[in-house]
């Protein structure tokens, strides 16, 4: 439902990422049984992808760019060609503010050879990339993996703040802290590809 955040949990190999891929219209191989409905309507895969954003488990950032440059690059790729540069800049600044990235907007992202932004900031930049298109539903695969408990809490708090816009958020999450877990509205637990538990 709109304005709610759902945690998707289960052991490795239980089908969490596969389920996210199906829901986001990203699954292109294998048989899919059943239907994916959006607000009670069946949509074509392309329409579904236009309404959703997806954040992969592993960072997909270009280390040589600054945070703002990375977001502008993504805006150039994802937004319609008719979108003016000024409008793209407004969107980029908006997601920078939403995710608390103002302090590192002009910092180089970095890589193994070049120091850059922190792990928590990198996760929030990945979330910002998905928000450029203003999706109504945001799917995230393990957004807190590789982070210490403090950074993981910050990332989940950033996601929770996005609910105020009526967005729906679904994320796979492994061993969340009690503080992070308390921010989720609903929990789905998968086991061997089947729903073992679903509820608030």
Where are these regions (language model features)?
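Conserved ABC transporter NBD signature motif
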Residues: 1, 24, 32-42, 48-50, ...
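The feature captures the beta-strand-to-loop junction immediately N-terminal to the Walker
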Residues: 9-12
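Q-loop/switch helix immediately C-terminal to the Walker
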Residues: 54, 58, 63-80, 91
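Conserved ABC ATPase "signature" region
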Residues: 72, 76, 87-108
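Catalytic Walker B motif of ABC-type/P-loop ATPase nucleotide-binding domains
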Residues: 138-142
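Helical segment within the ABC ATPase nucleotide-binding domain
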Residues: 152-165
